[in-house]
């Protein structure tokens, strides 16, 4: 009887010690699993090139967007060269064109209802046009203007920092700002923007990746590689990827860059 009792005590003691070891091990395993599947880790996607099309010659692309008829609106930069252009992606033919004053360096563009907004780089001036490229309004903002897109009842603007600025689409008054982060770190040099289904797709100056951003939080949810586009002929340091236009009714985009001679029709995969 004594031997059986001692055996029982020894077994219970062993089981208690095993439990004390197992619990923290399980906890550590759970923590490790949570870290490896962090909800803040972005998707890593790429583009598939479907087609190419001509771009108006010598265009220092600052903004690109599809109009209601499938033509493309193009905003270009450089002092004395800045323009607002409507052209056919099928032929490259310029259908409509407006030259900015030589004192203005054109930047990002977007459509809002029947209007077109165009930013300027250092003058802090936003220009609004009607569908015939007649200027109907001019508004001012602080800092530089880089990229612009229309998201539901607001315009979203970049200024070369890690900040998205939420602007009133009628007055261009600033409503709020959001800092863009990739896994907790700020994403600087945000450039051309395209708003699609509540997300913002952004070029980053000097980068060959496109970032998909939640505009309300600033979180980058996808990093999209454009390595499938052959950029070997674009050798000037200024010839960077810059220009994103969603093709309505599809999951496709037109992409281009500064001084590029072609558009690339792509699908994100």
What function would you assign to each model-found segment?
Residues 61, 190, 236-245:
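Signature of short aromatic-glycine-proline-rich micro-motifs recurring in repeat-based ectodomains
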Residues 50-83, 98-99, 103-110:
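Beta-strand-rich domains and repeat architectures in extracellular enzymes and scaffolds
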Residues 72-78, 111, 116-123, 157-161, ...:
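Conserved beta-strand positions in repeat-built beta-propeller and related beta-rich domains
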Residues 28-30:
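C-terminal motif of bacterial Sec signal peptides marking the signal peptidase cleavage site
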Residues 88-92, 130-134, 169-172, 214-218, ...:
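Short loop/turn segments that connect beta-strands within beta-propeller blades
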Residues 32-34:
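Bacterial signal peptide processing site
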Residues 52-57, 98-102, 137-142, 179-185, ...:
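Surface loop/turn motifs at the tips and blade-to-blade linkers of beta-strand repeat domains
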């Amino acid at each position: 009887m004594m031997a059986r009792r001692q055996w029982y005590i020894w077994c219970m003691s062993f089981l208690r010690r095993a439990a004390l070891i197992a619990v923290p091990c399980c906890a550590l395993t759970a923590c490790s699993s949570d870290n490896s599947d962090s909800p803040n880790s972005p998707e890593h996607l790429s583009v598939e090139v479907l087609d190419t099309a001509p771009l108006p010659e010598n265009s220092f692309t600052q903004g690109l967007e599809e109009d209601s008829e499938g033509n493309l609106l193009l905003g270009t930069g450089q002092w004395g060269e800045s323009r607002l252009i409507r052209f056919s992606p099928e032929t490259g033919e310029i259908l409509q064109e407006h030259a900015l004053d030589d004192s203005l360096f054109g930047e990002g563009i977007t459509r809002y209802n029947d209007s077109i907004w165009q930013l300027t780089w250092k003058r802090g001036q936003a220009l609004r046009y009607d569908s015939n490229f007649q200027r109907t309004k001019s508004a001012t903002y602080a800092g530089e203007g880089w990229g612009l897109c229309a998201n539901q009842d607001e315009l979203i603007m970049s200024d070369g920092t890690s900040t998205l600025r939420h602007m009133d689409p009628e007055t261009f008054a600033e409503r709020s700002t959001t800092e863009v982060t990739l896994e907790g770190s700020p994403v600087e040099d945000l450039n051309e923007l395209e708003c699609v289904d509540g997300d913002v797709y952004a070029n980053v100056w000097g980068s060959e990746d496109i970032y998909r951003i939640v505009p309300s939080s600033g979180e980058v949810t996808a990093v999209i590689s454009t390595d499938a586009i052959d950029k070997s002929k674009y050798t000037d340091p200024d010839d960077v990827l810059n220009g994103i236009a969603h093709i309505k009714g599809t999951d496709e985009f037109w992409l281009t860059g500064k001084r590029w001679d072609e558009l690339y029709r792509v699908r994100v995969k």
